[in-house]
Amino acid sequence: MRYRKGSEENHCERFQEAISVSASSGVPAAYYSFRDDYQSIRMTAEYGGTIRIESIITATGEQGELTQHPQGLIQFRTRRITDSESNLNETCEGPTLLHIVGQDEDGFNVHLESLLARMLRGRSMITLTRNTEAYLRDNTHMLTTVSRDRVNDLVNQLKSPKSSLRRAAVRQLSSYGSSAVPLLRSTLARHDLDPEQQARIKSILANRVRIDDDTPTSLAQLLAADRDHWQILARRMDQTQFVAANDHVLRCGLESLSP
């Protein structure tokens, strides 16, 4: 990874911001802060480590925090400052920001939308999520179907004593593209995998990282076999869309969606 150590600050009448990049034992870390009349934000990120974004709304004191630990889910929570326990506090988690926005769009909009729009060069994370969800609802029949049982069979094949079978399993899993990513991630929770299987799965997942801009179509394929996301989306489906989505989930070998 290429990076440049140093610090930079920007102050004007409307806002103040600062960024600092350092390194310890060759591992870079970044710290960013932003403040205007609306909110203050702090973001810390260590390469290969934990990412944390903290937000405080100036007028209300409402707090938002997004955290992702290495190889872990993204966690997002908002807290209202009250004298008693508030049922307005929200906590959700998921493997992608689309899962987070799908569960707490209002909280994300209050605390993180403006920051993410700057990081995405003006693109709205909420708009991208809405368009992806619309594509999933309206084009369920066009999505790639990858069976969980087939993925598990190929993962088992990764520990075959024959190298030709192991290579064939890697090629087949890789050929599924991003549609197999949620299923491959879930297999890492299995307790019967040997170190070589785990390493091969992680290598396949690492090779699935894309450097081009995400689109609703590409993100929909990534989420095609993600039951958790389908369940989040089910709350905003009509009956016809729900039936089509549930049929697709069952074809992927996943559990039926809850109505």
Where do the protein language model's features map onto the residues?
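Extended repeat-based scaffolds of very large eukaryotic assembly and lipid-transport proteins
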Residues: 1-259
